[in-house]
Amino acid sequence: MDLEYYEASAVVLEERALPALTTSTEETTAKQTSTNTDDDKTTSTSTSTSTGTSSKNTKLPSLTTKTTDGSTLTTSTGTSSTETASYTTPVMELPSAKGNPNIWSSNKPTGTVFIAVGSAAGFIFLALLVWFIINTWMSYSQAKQLKKFNNMEKQFQNPFIDDIDFSSGGGYYKADEDISTYKDTPVPTKNGGNNSFTPYKRASHSMIRLLGGSTDDGFGGGTPSSIGNTNLGSMNPLERVDAIDAANTGVRKSLYISPTMEVMNQQRRSTLFNNLNQSAVSIDTPEMMEPTRTVSPERRTYKHEKSKSSLSKLVDSTIDLTASTTLDNQKRQGRSKGHNKSSSITPSVYLDNMLEDNS
């Protein structure tokens, strides 16, 4: 039996995985023995040993091809061996943003946009609330003041103003809360008496006449015919003027003021007060006479005569009454002065006469 040794080169084709690099080596030894016993019968025995190492497990079987110098081609299937391998997994880390110009970073606190928007909305809401409160308060004040003025206007336009109870708080000054403190408080007068009228009723004659009321002093609402029942001779000139004014204008129900009547009243007052000391008596009525430089003297004289002739019928009774009263007073004063001059009694003689009368 001839033993022949063949050296064969083998190429292994196997699956590889990336990126790891796998290398493998394999050594194969083949031994063949042939024995010829007879001429007609030939027996051939071949032994093949294959050893190999691999650094990775393979899923598919490897293919081994051997080539010999002779005419015999032998193909065999090799088996792969199992080995243990260890792998290291790297840890992924994010790059730092510090000093990196390619990464944007903000130095503002978190929620800056939310804080800015909320602050702006809150400021607007607060401003609207303050404006609403101020507008409401101003409207309330104006409405209250307007209501007060409307009440005053209604009182002035009331033809029955004398029937209003001023002490009950329904008068012109309704807003005064302390009206009850001087409701019935008597006020001392010049003559020593007490005036129990309230401050609302102690108004001037001109205001009461404009409002359509009376003076509440015994002459309000009087008429020219009722003056004859009053003793004008027992009054001082100021009281007589008030009585005549109240009698002439007590029926006034409007706010219209006649300039002609005011001029007549001014002339009548000047006639009544000609014997009084002008420094001690003050007239509340403003001067209503015409200015001296407004018209020429000719026109002024013509106008005076015309007004005097047209108004003579209205004031005949009043002028006659006041003239007669003035003449009576002048006569009395003249008689008293003449009597004093004629007698000229000294104090000692006057005392002697008193003692003689008593005895």
From Swiss-Prot:
It is a single-pass membrane protein. InterPro entries: PRM. Disulfide bonds: none annotated. The chain crosses the membrane at residues 114-134. It comes from the Eukaryota. Residues 19-93, 289-359 are annotated as: Disordered. Keywords: Membrane, Transmembrane, Transmembrane helix, Vacuole. Residues 319-328 have a biased composition (Polar residues). Its main location: membrane. Residues 22-36, 43-89 have a biased composition (Low complexity). The keyword Transmembrane helix applies. The keyword Transmembrane helix applies. It is found in: Vacuole membrane. One of its GO terms (cellular component) is cellular bud neck. Belongs to the PRM5 family. This is Vacuolar membrane protein KLLA0F03465g. The lineage of its organism: Eukaryota, Fungi, Dikarya, Ascomycota, Saccharomycotina.
